[in-house]
Amino acid sequence: MTLYPQDGQSSPVNFKKKDVEITGCKTLYKGFFTLKSYQLRHKLFDNKGMSNEIVREVLIRDHAVGLLPYDPLLDQVVLIEQLRIGALEANEDNSPWLLEIIAGMIKTGENPEEVARREAREEAGIELKRCRSMLSYLASPGGMNERLSIMVGEVDATTAKGVHGLLEENENIRVHVVSREQVCRWVEEGVIDNAASIIALQWLALHFQALKEEWK
């Protein structure tokens, strides 16, 4: 184990893409998602050379944007509720209808803010005022390539209501307006249990005061 100073520490990760040798790649499935199988070798820690050849499967999908609509005047957030097939497949007792932040895939030529504004209209019937980035992260890098960019958008929460979604995509999405304090309790209680929403709401819990000051 290496101990690092608390201030001014750059990333301790030294290996790069050049330290991976891809010896083979094939597409196993191509539909809404693409599934690929890689054969590869990679550099080992402690100067122990290269690994044996290993096989790794990866799910390929477009990168996406998550949006947390926030009303700084009312101190409320807008969430959506919809059926999620992954939650259904998880075979849990919990409902497969999840409370989530708004989200959508990035189309060719779009930037994250454009996606956030489009999805806010499509999924919640709301218009964003100011919008800013929170962070971005790899959703599940052990088996998927997707990077999710999370944004927070200023809204008038009194305009958020009803059921929305695109008919051609068979979306059926219900809108919820909830106080910031309540959604933070829901995160702690496990009512909200999907990663993008938890990350966005924890960010808001840390930064809401600064955000109110920025957007006043």
Locate predicted features:
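Short helix-capping/linker segments at secondary-structure and domain boundaries
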Residues: 205-216
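Alpha-helical and coiled-coil interaction segments, frequently adjacent to or embedded
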Residues: 1-24, 29-32
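Conserved Nudix-box catalytic region and its N-terminal flanking loop in Nudix hydrolases
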Residues: 2-5, 56-61, 73-118, 167-169, ...
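Acidic, metal-coordinating catalytic segment for phosphate/diphosphate chemistry
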Residues: 28-74, 82, 88
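Buried hydrophobic packing segments
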Residues: 197-207
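A generic structural micro-feature
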Residues: 30-32, 59, 93-95, 143-145
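Unchanged
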Residues: 44, 53-54, 63-66, 102-195, ...
